[in-house]
Amino acid sequence: MAVWKIRIVCFPQKWKQFLNLLPNASQKSSASLRLANQWAASGKFALHYGPAALLREREKSVKSGCEDRRAKNQGSIQPPARKNSPAQKNGIRKSKTSRWRAAVLIFVQLCMVAHIIQWRFMGKTISPIEPSETMQTLQGGAINAGFIFFAVAILATLIFGRFVCGWGCHILALQDFCAWMLKKIGLTPKPFRSRLLVYVPLGAALYMFVWPTAARFFSSSGPGPLIPKFTNHLVTNNFWQTFPSVPVAIPFLIICGFVTVYFLGSKGFCTYACPYGGFFGLADKLAPFRIRVTDACNQCGHCTATCTSNVLVHAEVKAYKMVVDPGCMKCMDCVSVCPNDALYVGFGKPAIAVSKSSGKTRNYSVTWPEEILGAAVFLGSLLSVRGVYGLVPFLMALGYASVTTFLTLKTWRLLRASELSFYRFNLTSSGRIQKAGWGFLGFSIFWVGLNAHSGWVRYHEFEGDRAFQRIQIPDELALAQTNPDPWLSPIDRENILEGEKHFQRASNFGLFMNSEALSKLAWFEYLSGDAEQSVELLSQAAEHQKGQARALSLYYRGTILNRLGRYEQARTSLDEALAQRGDLILARQEKGESLWQLGRKEEAIAVWIDAVQRNASLALTNNLLAGAEQSLGRFVEGTAHENQADQSTPDVPLYHWMLGMRLKALGMNELAEKHFHRAIQLDPGYQERPK
């Protein structure tokens, strides 16, 4: 007959095992069992009973603070978990830190909402505290709150690691919330581990923040100085100017929050798409403040199981005595759940000072051939969706491309593997695709197909834009008369045909309207002689635009209406343009022409005077004022404006000819003939040009 023993051990929360064995007792020794149960009920001890041989084996195998799972099922009596140390069903206690971090992240979200509400009510506020605003500083010299925040965050990361990411990022909060919801329905996100795609965030960061300055450095004709003149933009009245519209922001948050987490694992966007994390990851390698380990660690793995940053904590602390993965966002869950208090945060040597020669071996989700295929798919997907329809921002495109890469590689395996699963669903079994597999395949085809369609549309948008950029005729000359055809070069005619073809294909087969491409198509229509169609397209574009883009579409619409003789409609369109951008001086110049043609000459002169007061070097406006004053018999004022015009008019035959045509259209014939004559003096070939 087997001898039974009763043993009392402390809970894992005590980080120490009591190996006291009670005196031998028979299986039916109710007195001993009752005494042991009383001790166990106190919450300080766990009671295990069973054959003595099993307990001896268990005693050898159980590590300090970690309960052997085999013995749990051999008659273990588990007392209630203590309130100050809750335990989950899997034996890992809940993190105390997670609630504090959740509270901080919720507070960050509330601050963002309050920031927006304050701007809506007051009309002015602190500029967005968003790292992407740093691009405005580096390219235009605008010192804003986003630049200051990003700079301080990088400096803090250099010392303390990626605490800003783990405790202050609103996108990370969304991802953690989505991961929490998935776990609530029994789906634990599994990390997708890639060797190459982890470098995407750094590449994106260099593209956003370094490439523009590098391009100016290596380009002799780059736009502006290498280091711009810095100006104060800490306060703004257009808070949402650099953000996508709400209809775009919603799918952006869905893709970068839920979709990336579902397919790529917890914090999937941070790992494979976030450009700010590219810089934070580099800074983290230099940070001396890290998660470290003492000799009390017994490799139980609770830390890794709890980590939401997909860090193999138990392996890293074993190999390096600290966490060196730059993906660690210092959520501190691993420290909180460690049953032995073996993990702590403290100062010491940084990760960059650790030799990796004897380090851990990582398991990846894909093979090297699949890595190369995935990198190609990612690049193609990114180029396909970024900026398509003029809607998709860079960060959203990065998230979309990451998911496309995963789906492509998973589909490749689905079609080749005999056994494949995703979460708890079997995609293939015994070489046959299961129902879940067909569902996954259908979604993958839809997602990748949408990506391919976006790539087709984006190609035509890109080629149409290239043709637009190659147009050589100046706007002033093209708009000097209703039909610009006589002034078009053979290259311009070729580019007009190419541009029209590509933009029309993108428009006809696209799912959404690209208002920017529509404006360019309108310009092609005008140059090809269809001014009425151009006006219609500009009206459609303006309905879907805001700010400067809307102002420009309305300006060109009003200008073309002036050439068509529809002056009242032109004036209305130009007033709408000025309502969007009061500093659009060319719109004031054109509005003056509308008023002049409507017979409201004094109003026209007042508008032109307002324009030259804003910019005294406007050659055409000064010429218009000179002609207007002279036509009304005010020769002194007219001569003054004419002299000012002569000082700012380029002595180029083409420009003089353009001025002559504009003045002649307004009935200012004497001044017009002066410029025609000067153009012929500079180039006798202009005698054959139509006036």
Regions found by a protein language model. Give the residues of each.
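Hydrophobic/aromatic packing residues within the alpha-helices of TPR/SEL1-like helical repeat arrays
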Residues: 496, 503-504, 538, 574, ...
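Non-ligating segments of multi-cofactor redox enzymes
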Residues: 11, 18, 49-50, 54, ...
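Helix-start (N-cap) detector for alpha-helical repeat units in TPR-like alpha-solenoids
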Residues: 457, 514-516, 548-552, 585-586, ...
